[in-house]
UniProtKB/Swiss-Prot annotation:
It comes from Mus musculus (Mouse). Keywords: Cell projection, Cytoplasmic vesicle, Nucleus, Repeat, Synapse. Residues 13-37, 533-607, 659-682, 701-762, 782-1002, 1064-1102, 1173-1373, 1405-1436, 1483-1509, 1520-1539, 1553-1595, 1716-1738 are annotated as: Disordered. It is found in: Cell projection, Axon; Presynapse; Cytoplasmic vesicle, Clathrin-coated vesicle; Nucleus. This is BTB/POZ domain-containing protein 8. One of its GO terms (biological process) is synaptic vesicle budding from endosome. Residues 852-863, 1210-1219, 1716-1737 have a biased composition (Low complexity). Interacts (via N-terminus) with adapter protein complex AP-2 subunits alpha (AP2A1) and beta (AP2B1).
Length: 1751
């Protein structure tokens, strides 16, 4: 604090000789000193005069002419020694206030004299002499008097001068404080000088002040006059007033000396040793305002050199002065210092002493520096800050300065962008341009231009354009060579203006633009003023920021394709645009990604196709890839394209690709490019990038417009499928028209939810994806067969998942987007939740337009009929195929992401009901997407199931798909196909006008399939759609689907259905009535489809439609139970029913076709692949090829080779989905435990996303997991998949894509137990990937054992499951309701749905048992379903639990296997993944059937049951056939499909006795598989109360799954399996629980943006509450039950894994161990599970942490 040495010396010099001392000082110094001196002297004069007037502490009284004057001897002595001497001789020195007469002077004259003495700043010697003369003349005394008095006077004078005794005293006692420097201090005036002499001479002192042991003798009167502090102290109120000596604290003797000098003399300087800062404090303390001013003056002079141009030695001292001024509070000085620092900030900030400045002062420096920005200095400050950053060393003391400089630079850039037009005219900007021209890199200019691009808004775009024109025309710019840079920015601005013309033309700056520019923009404008499109119009960042939901997507799309913007804003009018856009603004990111992918794909399509073909040839690998694809349903289109292509290349990769594809829509460009790079593999980068984008934007959109963007994104994937067909159509006029219809429907849906824009985008994205897919398909015409097969299958799987997401639709859109980002499996689930909402919308849209239904169905049919369509569209699509494929890839990815997000949305969407549905339909390619949404509704759990299945239960997924397809074989196939394929295919059908109609129906079917979550709705839609489609395109579709798409459709549908069943189960639980109705009808439809492939199917479809309509009513009843969910479903049903008949008919025909296709597809993997190729070759170019292409294209486009890696990542996504599934299941701990699951740990996002609670999970994923996390998670899984792929075909497949494993597994089922419906469902799943045939065969066997166990368990748990189902049904409806949906879902789903199906294997095991128990009470309401339910639940539980333990170790594999194991005991060990998946899918199928049947039981149970068994058989047969075909490489997919051996085998393995139950209760099986797996799981884990079980299962399941997910996620990719499983049961349960939770969260979740946050918050709350209220049968049954249920299920699953598995389970375990050896022993997993279940209380009150630790 001491002033600098130079400053210290200066004062002395100045004091000694002001003139000399100021020699080096500028004129500013002397002027300030003069002013200070005048002020101080004036103050001193007033203070001393006050002594006289107030007669303070006087000691003498003078009597003049009768008047008395009280005076002070000391003052008189100091000022008038002669007068003092004259008076004193008459007084006694000992007396105080002695009266002294003064004669010879008038009173008035004497008074004036005294005033002069006390106040004059001048020498008063003349006045004194006059008075003394008068006194002498008037004296009566002789000369003696004068003589006598003179000596006294003289003595007095001498004494005053310090020559007598006093001087000795002074030297003796005054040396301590009187120094030479002190003597040099300059007094303010003569008065000050006289008083200072008095102080130094110490005459008449009357008080001693002790400081630091030193004594300062002073005068009370002067102290009191000068200091308010001393005046109060000595006034008589304090004890010091009567003391001779007082002691002062808190002050040093140096400071006291300075203060005394100022009090007496008003000195203007300080001694060298003085601490100026401390003296400032002393001045404040003692009330010496003058001293404060002196101190400030000294600081300015000695520290700051009066703020003249700083010199190096003053940098540090000014900073020190700044600190002093801040600490003492001298604002004026602080401001001066700050202004100086601002003027030279670069020099000050680079000072080392700047690091010592308090942080608050540093912040003030920065803020004031920013405030100082103006048009003139902004460019200069930018350059200075850059120099500072470049010049500072990277050491600790510069950290603060570097940080501040970086912030300042950002602020400068922001300011420059905001005031660009003014700043470019400043001189400093010219200097900036010059410096940048001379610099090696014009990084500052690039920063400015990038900021301009990122901050373009409608308001500033015109002014920016004019400013850039000004720059371009300036000579300096041309000379410096920045023309290209400026033109690039101007080009983007121009694109924005063209795309946002309608918004821009209303701004004030528009009128200022050049007329030529205005006219050009108006002519080129995409938007001529459609208000609806305007909402989605903004393409750039600013717009995105404004529009959190659709704008984000729009922005994403716009930069990539101006057309995207237009489709976003005018879905109806911009159908063609949507085709190119990938459905519009909300799909913008996806569309952009797809476009980018398309561009890449155009070059690499052939490569991709060949890769796909190669992979297809690979068989196992291809199967694996396809399995992943199933998991990947979220990224329907691009994922499909990629997955199909990728699946051929890398079995393990497709799943990752799926995950990546899911992410890709989010990432957009980056993903596309990546996808292109990784044609064969799922793009890992794509996943990361896309996921990041999707996550950021869709989630952003989600949060801002939760349903808009996410829905868009989610539906985008589906839409991409349907859009693929649509886009193909859009490529041509027909395509456009188709898209228009779909989009019109989307529009219709648009009003319902803010998601409509996003969904519309999704539609566009879907279309794009479809085109892309198609393009790829075309390219790979020859390989299309293989590729298409896988692609179709993948597409179907994805479609089913997407459908599930669509079910969630808009509500779940955002959360689903998050989930998608999290992982492919999550993407699947998310997509399906979206579908939930979408199906009603689709129904509405379809009702509005036949095309829409056709579109939906078309998506399914698209795969099949799309092959025909592909041919038709070949020309059309060929025009747009690559671009569309690219778009589709993006869209698909984004859509998948959105769909994952939508999963949570579905709960809220049920509330919105028709509205959400309408929006969903809007989001989706209306019919297809709506159908997808419908399916998604049912599939929110299904997507996870699908993902899980994909991971390890692809067979399961296919089994489920098969099962569902038996119900909704055409519809479900269409729907399932639509799930992944609807996105791709719907676009294709739409491109084809005729086919478009059918394909739309397929889309609807796909949507329905998706709405497997809302099975009632979905199945209703499917039946209707099947009917409609059949009526419209029954024969055509049948032939086309049967020929080309049936394989894809069947497999995809099976896949979807497989995922759907679980999802349906879960959703069925939360939305069980609706789902059940849908499922039943879907099963009916499937069965009918299988029975009557074309005409017969049409009739059954119609029956289904009727049944669905009937179901719709009961669903309404269910709706009563779960008003929101049911509402949504009912809305969907109502809307869909009109469409459903056609679609159902079509789908029935499709089912027949699909059944054939399933067989074909099963065979397609190998023999049926030829079939598929033949059919698909004709249709594959478009249909199959397109699905393939979309898969490959989107995936490859997005990531190229990386994509396939992402395929494993997709599996991880699946695992993530599992985690998400688990998450939703543990709704209560969604907030914190969303990432506890295997997938969650690796990719917490995916976990959450795929969680049962579509709304909750989707949001959770979005909120919790970042795209980076997702990437990491996916990357880990991807790595596993790759290793597995490379290491072992089956093992690789299992690891890479569990769905492939299930496919292989279903093969054995199909062979060994063709008679088992469930196994058949598994077979189609299993047979999807040909490469997996071997694994699938073994898996089938394992699955069969698991199925037997499941059958046994079903027998045990059938009544509880039914009971649980019933309870859950009410909750199920709530699942459709955002908030209500969560509540009911988490409660009902936990109990009614076999969350285990959707849960990861671990989760399923845990949840399955707990859920089983929980569901056991609830599922009895399923009545007829109970046997099947129990079977599904139990066997699923046993296997799932066993798988669960392993899953902990091999999260992914185990997850898949868990489901499969639950479904197939035997399959568990060797093909645990496959088994789990197969089982899972079987269960899913069963669960779907069960769900349908449950719904039917709720609504038309009888018909439903009957239909269900048939459907299930058909599905099982299909699955079996599919699996068998894949493994056996048979071409008679139809026969195999009918056989359904895998499914039956599953039951046999599980329990021979249960197999009959399953076949008879097949429809119930689907539901029970949902409810029972949970039930069984609960049962297996331990018999916990349903609610307790639910909670325990949820929390525990999450933990276990999480632990497993962590463990096995890396080695295995059960994550996807986990996701599908989770989706099947956990999604529904969690969805309902989430719905309960999200009831609260989703009440705010009307704002789709708040879904994730709310869900997480609710989950956290629930988790926290859950610990306290483990038995949540009261206030928060759903929420707390979720956590408790998860825990219970985890424990029960663990216990069940060890106990009830039996030989079949042991066998499964052994096989699983083989499969999961890299990860962990199945036995170890089982043991872990057992330990946790054993250790935990029956209530499953373990904390999630404990469970996690245990597992």
């Amino acid at each position: 604090m001491a002033h600098c040495g130079a400053g210290g010396a200066a004062p002395v010099a100045l004091l000694s000789s002001p003139g000399h001392g100021r020699k080096g000082l500028p004129r500013k110094g002397p002027g300030e000193r003069r002013r200070l001196k005048a002020a101080v002297s004036e103050q001193l004069s007033r203070d001393v005069l006050r002594l006289l007037r107030e007669e303070i502490h006087t000691d003498t009284i003078l009597s003049v002419s009768g008047s008395l004057f009280k005076v002070h001897k000391a003052v008189l002595l100091a000022r008038a020694p002669g007068f003092h001497s004259h008076i004193i001789e008459h007084t006694s020195s000992d007396l105080t206030n002695e009266l002294v007469p003064v004669d010879g002077v008038e009173a008035s004259e004497f008074k004036a004299f005294l005033q002069i003495v006390y106040s004059s700043n001048k020498n008063i010697k003349n006045y004194e002499e006059e008075i003394v003369k008068k006194l002498k003349v008037g004296s009566l005394m002789p000369e003696k008097g004068p003589d006598v008095s003179f000596p006294r006077y003289r003595t007095s004078s001498d004494c005053f001068l310090g020559k007598g005794e006093i001087p000795e005293d002074i030297t003796g006692g005054g040396d301590c404080f009187i120094s030479k420097a002190d003597s040099d201090l300059e007094p303010a005036s003569e008065l000050g000088g006289d008083l200072l002499k008095l102080y130094l001479s110490q005459h008449y002192p009357d008080i001693d002040i002790c400081v630091d042991g030193r004594s300062f003798r002073a005068h009370r009167a002067i102290l009191s006059a000068r200091s308010s502090y001393f005046a109060a102290m000595l006034s008589g109120c304090w004890a010091e007033s009567s003391q001779e000596c007082i002691t002062l604290q808190g002050i040093t003797h140096v400071e006291m000396n300075v203060m005394m000098h100022f009090i007496y003399g008003g000195t203007l300087d300080f001694p060298e040793k003085a601490n100026v800062g401390q003296i400032l404090n002393v001045a404040d303390m003692y009330g010496l305002e003058g001293l404060r001013e002196v101190a400030i003056y000294v600081l300015r002079r000695d520290y700051c050199n009066f703020f003249q141009k700083p010199v190096p030695r003053t940098w540090a001292s000014i900073l020190e002065c700044l600190i002093i001024a801040h600490s003492v509070g001298v604002e004026s000085l602080f401001a001066d210092c700050m202004n100086c620092i601002i003027s030279h900030f670069a020099r000050f900030w680079s000072e080392r002493s700047f690091a010592n400045v308090p942080p608050e002062i540093q912040k003030t420096c920065l803020s004031m520096q920013i405030q100082s920005l103006n048009h003139g200095n902004a460019a200069f400050l930018l350059m200075e800050s850059d120099r500072l950053i470049m010049g500072l060393p990277r050491v600790k003391w510069t950290e603060a300065a570097l940080s501040m400089a970086s912030q300042l630079q950002e602020e400068c850039v922001t300011f420059i962008v905001e005031n660009f037009s003014q700043i470019i005219e400043s001189e400093n900007f010219t200097l900036l341009l010059q410096s940048q021209a001379m610099s090696s890199t014009a990084h500052l200019l690039d920063k400015i231009f990038k900021a301009i691009e990122d901050n373009i808004t409608a308001e500033n775009s015109c002014s920016l354009l004019m400013a850039l024109d000004t720059l371009l025309n300036s000579e300096s710019t041309k000379e410096m060579g920045f023309t290209c840079r400026i033109q690039a920015v101007r080009g983007k601005l121009w694109a924005f203006l063209v795309q946002s013309f309608y918004a821009v033309r209303h701004t004030g700056s528009w009128k200022l633009m050049h007329l030529d520019d205005q006219q050009k923009i108006q002519v080129a404008a995409l938007d001529k003023g459609d208000d609806r499109r305007l909402g989605r119009k903004p393409v750039l960042t600013s717009s995105q920021q404004r529009r959190q939901g659709s704008d984000v997507d729009v922005l994403k799309i716009k930069p990539w394709t101006e057309n995207n913007k237009k489709p976003c804003q005018t879905s109806l009018s911009t159908n063609q645009k949507m085709r190119s856009d990938g459905l519009g603004a909300s799909g913008h990111a996806s569309s952009t990604n797809r476009n980018s992918i398309n561009k890449v794909s155009k070059h690499g399509d052939s490569t991709k196709m060949s890769k796909v073909v190669k992979e297809m040839k690979t068989g196992g690998k291809y199967v694996s890839g396809k399995s992943k694809t199933m998991v990947k349903p979220q990224t329907e289109n691009s994922d499909h394209t990629k997955i199909e292509g990728l699946s051929s290349t890398v079995v393990g990769r497709p799943s990752r690709v799926t995950a990546a594809g899911r992410k890709d829509p989010v990432h957009g460009k980056g993903v596309q490019n990546q996808e292109v790079e990784t044609t064969g593999a799922r793009p890992k980068v794509l996943t990361a990038n896309l996921n990041v984008q999707a996550r950021a934007k869709p989630l952003q959109t989600l949060r801002g417009k939760d349903s808009t963007c996410p829905a868009s994104v989610g539906p985008s994937s589906r839409s991409t499928h349907s859009s693929t067909e649509l886009l193909a159509s859009m490529g041509s006029v027909d395509e456009t028209k188709e898209n228009g219809s779909v989009e019109d429907k989307c529009r219709d849906g648009k009003p319902y939810v803010s998601d409509s824009p996003g969904q519309m985008v999704s539609n566009g994205v879907m279309s794009t994806a479809a085109v892309k897919s198609r393009a790829v398909a075309r390219i790979t015409n020859g390989t299309a067969s293989n590729k298409s097969f896988t692609h179709e299958q993948d597409s179907h799987g994805n479609s089913s998942v997407i459908k599930r997401g669509d079910g969630k639709g808009l509500s779940a859109s955002a959360p689903q987007t998050a989930a998608k980002k999290r992982g492919s499996s999550n993407g699947c689930t998310a997509a399906q939740p979206r579908t939930k909402s979408a199906p009603p919308t689709l129904a509405q849209a379809q009702g509005s337009q036949g095309e829409s239904p056709h579109s939906v169905k078309s998506s399914v049919s698209s795969r099949q009929s799309d092959e025909n369509v592909t041919r038709l569209r070949h020309g059309t699509d060929k025009q747009i195929p690559k671009r569309k494929v690219v778009k589709q890839g993006h869209t698909t990815l984004q859509k998948v992401n959105a769909k994952l997000v939508p999963m949570p949305k579905i709960p809220s969407q049920p509330k919105k009901g028709g509205t959400v549905n309408s929006k969903d339909s809007k989001q989706k390619v209306l019919p297809g997407q709506i159908m997808l949404q419908s399916h998604a509704s049912q599939r929110p759990s299904k997507p996870e199931v699908a993902e899980k299945s994909v991971l390890h239960g692809v067979s399961d997924s296919r089994n489920h798909v098969s099962k569902q397809r038996p119900h909704e074989s055409p519809c479900t196939l269409a729907c399932d196909t639509s799930g992944p394929e609807v996105s791709q295919i719907p676009c294709r059908p739409q491109p084809q006008s005729p086919l478009g109609s059918q394909e739309k129906k397929r889309l609807e079917l796909a949507c329905q399939d998706r709405s497997t979550l809302g099975d009632s709705v979905k199945r209703e839609l499917r039946s209707e759609l099947a009917g409609i489609e059949q009526s419209h395109t029954s024969a055509y579709k049948d032939s086309s689907q049967c020929n080309g798409n049936p394989n894809c459709g069947s497999i995809a549908a099976l896949k979807s259905v497989i995922s759907n069943p679980n999802e349906n189960l879960i959703n069925s639980n939360p939305v069980h009535n609706s789902d059940s109705a849908n499922t039943e009808q879907a099963y009916l439809s499937d069965r009918e489809r299988e029975t009557g492939r074309e005409n017969t199917d049409t009739e059954p479809s119609m029956s289904c439609i009727n049944g669905k309509a009937f179901l719709c009513v009961p669903e309404g009843t269910s709706s009563t139970l779960n008003p929101t969910q049911s509402d949504r479903r009912l809305t969907f049903h109502g809307a869909a029913q009109s469409q459903l008949p056609d679609d159902c008919a079509t789908e029935d025909s499709k089912c027949a076709t699909v059944t054939s296709a399933v067989s074909s597809k099963c065979l397609l993997g190998q023999p049926s692949e030829k079939n598929c190729k033949n059919m698909e070759m004709s249709e594959t170019p478009e249909s199959h090829g397109t699905p393939e292409a979309p898969f490959v294209g989107p995936w490859d486009l997005n990531t190229g080779a990386t994509h396939q890696r992402e395929s494993p990542e997709s599996d991880t996504g699946s695992a993530t989905t599992s985690s998400d599934d688990i998450k939703p299941r543990s709704e209560d701990y969604d907030a914190g435990g969303s990432q506890d699951d295997e997938g969650s740990h690796d990719r917490g996002i995916s976990k959450c996303s795929t969680a049962l609670c579509h709304d909750f999970l989707g949001r959770s994923s979005s909120d919790t997991s970042t795209p980076e996390e997702l990437k990491v998670h996916e990357g880990d899984l991807r790595t596993e998949v790759r290793v597995r792929k490379q290491g072992g075909g089956d093992h690789q497949i299992h690891s890479a894509s569990d769905d492939e494993i299930p496919r292989k597994k279903p093969e054995p089922w199909s062979r060994s137990t063709i008679g088992y419906p469930r196994e058949k469902g598994s077979t189609p799943r299993g047979s999807i990937p040909s490469a997996q045939e071997g694994d699938q065969v073994s898996s089938s066997a394992d699955e069969t054992e698991d199925e037997r166990s499941e059958a046994e368990n079903v027998g045990e748990n059938s009544s509880p499951c039914s009971s649980g189902t019933q309870q859950v049904q009410g909750i199920i409806n709530l699942a459709f309701d955002d908030g209500a949906e969560h509540e009911s879902r988490e409660f009902s789903a936990t109990k009614k749905f076999r969350r285990s199906v959707l849960l990861s294997v671990d989760e399923c095991e845990e949840v399955g048992s707990d859920e089983g128990e929980g569901h056991t009470p609830f599922q009895p309401s399923l009545d007829s379903l109970s046997p099947s339910d129990v079977f599904d639940g139990v066997s699923y539980e046993h296997h799932g639990r066993t798988g669960y333990s392993r899953f902990f170790k091999e999260n992914e594999a185990t997850t898949a296997e868990h489901n499969h194991n639950k479904g197939n005991g035997g399959y568990k060990n060797e093909s645990f993944l496959l088994n789990s998946r197969s089982k899972d899918f079987e269960k899913q199928d069963k669960q779907c059937v069960s769900t349908d049947q449950k719904t039917r039981l709720d609504v038309p149970p009888k018909g439903s049951q009957q239909l269900f068994p048939e459907n299930e058989e058909v599905i099982s047969k299909r699955e079996a056939a599919h699996s068998f075909q894949q493994h056996s490489t048979f071409m008679d997919g139809d026969t195999k499909s009918q056989e359904r051996p895998c499914h039956l085998e599953l039951h046999q393995r599980e329990l021979s006795s249960n197999i009959p139950k399953i076949s008879s209760v097949k429809s119930l099986d689907s539901c029970p598989s949902q409810g029972l797996p949970q039930e069984g799981q609960v049962k297996e884990s331990r018999p916990t109360p349903p609610k307790g079980a639910n909670n325990a299962v949820f929390s525990g399941d999450i933990d276990d799954c999480d632990t497993m997910a962590q463990t096995s996620m890396y080695d295995h990719r059960p994550s996807k399996t986990l996701s599908p499983i989770y989706e099947m049961s956990l999604t529904a349960a969690c969805e309902q629980e989430v719905e309960s939770e999200t009831h609260v969260a989703d009440r705010g979740s009307e704002d789709e943006q708040h879904f994730a946050k709310q869900d997480w918050t609710l989950l956290r709350q629930l988790l926290s509450e859950q610990d306290a209220n483990l038995n949540i049968t009261s206030s928060l049954p759903e929420d707390l039950s979720l956590a408790q249920y998860l825990i219970n299920q985890t424990l029960l699953l663990a216990r069940d894994s060890s106990k009830p598995q039996g030989s079949a389970h042991a066998d499964t375990w052994n096989r699983w161990s083989e499969l999961s050896s890299p990860l962990d022993d199945s036995a170890t997993s089982a043991t872990t599970a057992s330990v946790s279940s054993t250790d935990c209380s029956p209530q499953g009150e373990w904390t999630i942490l404990e469970l996690e630790t245990q597992h």
